[in-house]
């Protein structure tokens, strides 16, 4: 029961954001008519004119439709993360994590860390969302002159806006001029023990990553597609379900605990040292092995679709780069199934169907069939 309750808590901001989009139809701007409605996917939803725009305006668009729709979906996901309901849900979960710390003296300090630094971490997360790059990565937009994806250790180059935001007041008395890699000493008026801020920061970020129900969110995002005509709705739903999980993986992969805590608290990039928190068995459970392999399989096939036969093995291994936390497992999956994958990709028109044939994915729950396109 607790597991289901947590999933609905995390799903709530998504549903609220979709509901908010339709409830804002009274906006005076909507009175401008179709010229305003169809400027963007978000405006069409707000003015309850998505069906009109798809049938009368966007239905006559050129070959860049999929690219633009993908970017619009990314923008909607970005907006969801900015909703107060989403941020409140994350905050409440982290406050519960603070409350179960084994050393109760750390609880007020843990909450203080949340108050000061959670907004900065959320801003950093949102700053990693680049619609054009993400949609090119999943194959819905043409590849431009983009720079190669940085490796985790290369991400220390901090953009100027983020550097400006890092000038935040430190916790009173918590830091010295030269903080250590795992703890910051306290002043004499503070607790008479070293406070492991860096370990605490890394632990909380890892917990948030672990409890985000990616599959549930993907289905929730796809629900907006039910307001459009059946054929176009099927395309929209498959776009949302197929790529939302890939998008979340790409975004969460950039919120590496060591990197974020290094930026915010000037922590060392070394692994944190500290006692493990009690397991979250009452709240979450890991994805079943088949779900994990299904996710690996679909990502690998999506990555290899537009490559030559000679380049396929390299493309498949590159697909594992986005799974920073499970990269080794992904590499093992690719090595184990390489012959079957090489045989499936040239004939593949849908990643889920191909992975179902491989035996690592279950039958899709949705009755709508995904569209087929040479660009995917």
UniProtKB/Swiss-Prot annotation:
InterPro entries: SAP_A, SapB_1, SapB_2, Saposin, Saposin-like, SaposinB_dom, Sphingo_Act-Surfact_Prot. GO terms for biological process: cellular response to mechanical stimulus; cellular response to nitric oxide; circadian rhythm; respiratory gaseous exchange by respiratory system; response to cAMP; response to dexamethasone; response to epidermal growth factor; response to glucocorticoid. Residues 63-145, 194-271, 290-365 form the Saposin B-type domain. Residues 1-24 form the signal peptide. Its main location: secreted. It is found in: Secreted, Extracellular space, Surface film. Glycans are attached at residue 306. Disulfide bonds join 67-141, 70-135, 98-110, 198-267, 201-261, 225-236, 294-361, 297-355, 320-330. PANTHER family: PULMONARY SURFACTANT-ASSOCIATED PROTEIN B, SAPOSIN-RELATED. This is Pulmonary surfactant-associated protein B. The lineage of its organism: Eukaryota, Metazoa, Chordata, Craniata, Vertebrata. The gene is Sftpb.
